[in-house]
């Protein structure tokens, strides 16, 4: 018989089949037909550890393998193992939906004997090599017989997963699962919870939700404070650059505004002068001459001003000479 893969301890087994660890010489598998491998167990809360152990049994031999899986009924299991979560029919049905299983044997015996092997034409029994205490009192190890006759096929366990571990997770978070089911419409009677415990659980859940909301708000406030700090640091780092840019733009605008004001004043002065000349009867030529004189005055050089100064001095000297000569004649 091949490895027993659904274990009675409800622990999962790994998928790679290992060499036999039994001291007896292992019998040779048949070559004219598929090898019939048997695996048994409780398979409560069927999980991937169970599936991997069944995969090991199915792939224990290179040729075609026919895998039979035995599952103990509720009476036998409760007597030697303890209470299960799933009923026997639920456990049988879980096994039937595993792709590695060819046949499910319900009401399997707690200890495999020669009569059972002959009845189902079993070649090998598959299970891990660790001794499994026989609580029925028939022997020290449930698989002691098949190991002695060389019809035991060893498998490896899958660490980290077992039915007991799953139950422990549920027990650990029992209150949360109770509240979840109460919120989904289950009554406290369905869950076996007293009135006082139900109220206490609801109060605790409200307090927990309040704590979660407070924590969420604190995180949001912290994020906003961090954002403000980042913006402040960015403003401080770029303040000088922003101020310099503003002053440059402001100075350029003031220069343009000053130029526009000067041009406007000059234009108004020219218009006013032109209007005065027209009132005095001067023609357009005189007006043009005024423009020329105006621009010449604005754009004239210092040399032109010097020439005008010397001309005026010469005129004054001539007038002085004339006055002196006139006075001399009068004295004569």
Swiss-Prot record:
Disruption phenotype: No visible phenotype under normal growth conditions.
Keyword GTP-binding: no
Regions of compositional bias (Low complexity) in chain numbering: 14-28
Keyword terms, alphabetized: Acetylation, Lipid biosynthesis, Lipid metabolism, Nucleotidyltransferase, Phospholipid biosynthesis, Phospholipid metabolism, Transferase
Binding site for CTP: 42-50, 81, 127-128, 132, 157-161
Thermal effects: Optimum temperature is 30 degrees Celsius.
Modified-residue entries (N-acetylserine), positions: 2
Gene3D superfamilies: HUPs
Pfam families linked: CTP_transf_like (PF01467)
Record's compositionally biased regions (Acidic residues): 281-293, 301-318
Stored InterPro entries: CCT, Cyt_trans-like, Pcy1-like, Rossmann-like_a/b/a_fold
Superkingdom of the source species: Eukaryota
Region (Disordered): 1-32, 276-332
E.C. numbers: 2.7.7.15
Catalytic activity: phosphocholine + CTP + H(+) = CDP-choline + diphosphate
Biased composition (Basic and acidic residues): 319-332
Pathway(s): Phospholipid metabolism; phosphatidylcholine biosynthesis; phosphatidylcholine from phosphocholine: step 1/2
Protein's job: Plays an important role in the biosynthesis of the phospholipid phosphatidylcholine. Catalyzes the formation of CDP-choline.
Recorded family membership: Belongs to the cytidylyltransferase family.
Protein name: Choline-phosphate cytidylyltransferase 1
Species of origin: Arabidopsis thaliana
């Amino acid at each position: 018989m091949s490895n027993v893969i659904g274990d009675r301890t409800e622990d999962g087994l790994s998928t790679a089949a290992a060499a036999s660890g039994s001291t007896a010489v292992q019998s040779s598998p048949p070559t004219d037909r598929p090898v019939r491998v048997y695996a048994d167990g409780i398979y409560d809360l069927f999980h991937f550890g169970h599936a991997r152990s069944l995969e090991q049994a199915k792939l224990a031999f290179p040729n075609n393998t026919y895998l039979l899986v035995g599952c103990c009924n509720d009476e036998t299991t409760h007597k030697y193992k303890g209470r299960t979560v799933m009923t026997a029919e639920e456990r049988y049905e879980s096994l039937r939906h595993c792709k590695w299983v060819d046949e499910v044997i319900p009401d399997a015996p707690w200890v495999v004997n020669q009569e059972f092997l002959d009845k189902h034409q079993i070649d090998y029994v598959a299970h891990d090599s660790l001794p499994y205490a026989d609580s029925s009192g028939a022997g020290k190890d449930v698989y002691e017989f098949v190991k002695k006759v060389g019809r035991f096929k060893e498998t490896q366990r899958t660490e980290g997963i077992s039915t007991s571990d799953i139950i422990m997770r549920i027990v650990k978070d029992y209150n949360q699962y109770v509240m979840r089911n109460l919120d989904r419409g289950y009554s406290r009677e369905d869950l076996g919870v007293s009135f006082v415990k139900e109220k206490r659980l609801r109060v605790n859940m409200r307090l927990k939700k309040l704590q979660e909301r407070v924590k969420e708000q604190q995180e949001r406030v912290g994020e906003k404070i961090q954002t403000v700090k980042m913006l402040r640091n960015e403003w401080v780092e770029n303040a000088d650059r922003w101020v310099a840019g503003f002053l440059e733009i402001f100075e350029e605008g003031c220069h343009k505004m000053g130029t526009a004001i000067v041009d406007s004043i000059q234009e108004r002065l020219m218009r006013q002068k032109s209007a005065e000349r027209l009132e005095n009867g001067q023609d357009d030529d005189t007006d043009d001459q005024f423009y020329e004189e105006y621009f010449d005055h604005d754009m004239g050089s210092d040399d032109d001003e010097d020439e005008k100064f010397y001309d005026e001095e010469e005129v004054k000297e001539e007038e002085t000479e004339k006055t002196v000569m006139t006075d001399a004649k009068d004295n004569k």
